[in-house]
Amino acid sequence: MTDSYKLPDNPGDPDATDDEGIHPDEVENLIEEAERTQGGSEDDDLLTTEPDPVVDAREDDRDPTLEEDLEGDLQAVLDDIDAELGVADTPEATGDLPTTEAQLAERTEDLQRVTAEYANYRRRTERERAGIIDTAKSGVVSKLLPILDDLDLAEQHGDLEEGPLKAFADKFRNTLTGLKVEAFGVPGDTFDPEIHEAVQDLSEGDTKVLGTVLRKGYRFNDKLIRNAMVIIADPEK
């Protein structure tokens, strides 16, 4: 081959390239222009983006009664709290007021009844206690009556006119009198079979009196502890 391709001395010279070649400075300009064009289109896409139909559909599908249900649940919780705290301003609580007043009246009546029963119990207990004490005292007095009988016999024989025995008899009788021990049975008193024990009846008429008192009778606190032993006779004319 006689023809051969000869490489230029400066291959990068624009004159050595073909007509369609691009100058290096033009390459940089083309790159910058492409970047501007791409960036502007992306911003325009963002600005012109239409609403997402899926999101709109979710917003349209919300239950319109959801807020009402939540408010109802919240009110129920508040009502429970009011009930625990004893707040009674609802019509139902106000309607229970007559029932509460009736219960209060019933409890008051029960308290009054129990109070009256307790007062009666105390009075009954005090009476029983006093009765037991009187019974014990009357038992002691009954054992002292023979001493009184001996003092009466000594007085009939004139042994209590003076001396230490008379002083003892006076103190002993005064002590029993202070204990509400009372002697009865004096000649001339009307005969009473309830308190007098007759060993002989010398009367001839319907009216009977005590002729001779063989042994005096005694009462303690108006309670008979021993009958008087007597002989019945007619009243003196």
Curated annotation (Swiss-Prot):
Chain spans, region Disordered: 1-65
Record field: compositional bias (Basic and acidic residues): 55-65
Keyword flag Chaperone: yes
Subunit: Homodimer.
Disulphide bonds in the chain: none
UniProt KW keywords: Chaperone, Cytoplasm, Stress response
Superkingdom of origin: Bacteria
An individual GO BP term: protein folding
Entry's family note: Belongs to the GrpE family.
GO MF, one example: protein homodimerization activity
Chain's role: Participates actively in the response to hyperosmotic and heat shock by preventing the aggregation of stress-denatured proteins, in association with DnaK and GrpE. It is the nucleotide exchange factor for DnaK and may function as a thermosensor. Unfolded proteins bind initially to DnaJ; upon interaction with the DnaJ-bound protein, DnaK hydrolyzes its bound ATP, resulting in the formation of a stable complex. GrpE releases ADP from DnaK; ATP binding to DnaK triggers the release of the substrate protein, thus completing the reaction cycle.
UniProt GO cellular component terms: cytoplasm
Protein location: Cytoplasm
Natural source organism: Corynebacterium efficiens (strain DSM 44549 / YS-314 / AJ 12310 / JCM 11189 / NBRC 100395)
InterPro entries with a match to the protein in the record: GrpE, GrpE_coiled_coil, GrpE_head
Pfam (any one): GrpE
Protein name (Swiss-Prot/TrEMBL): Protein GrpE
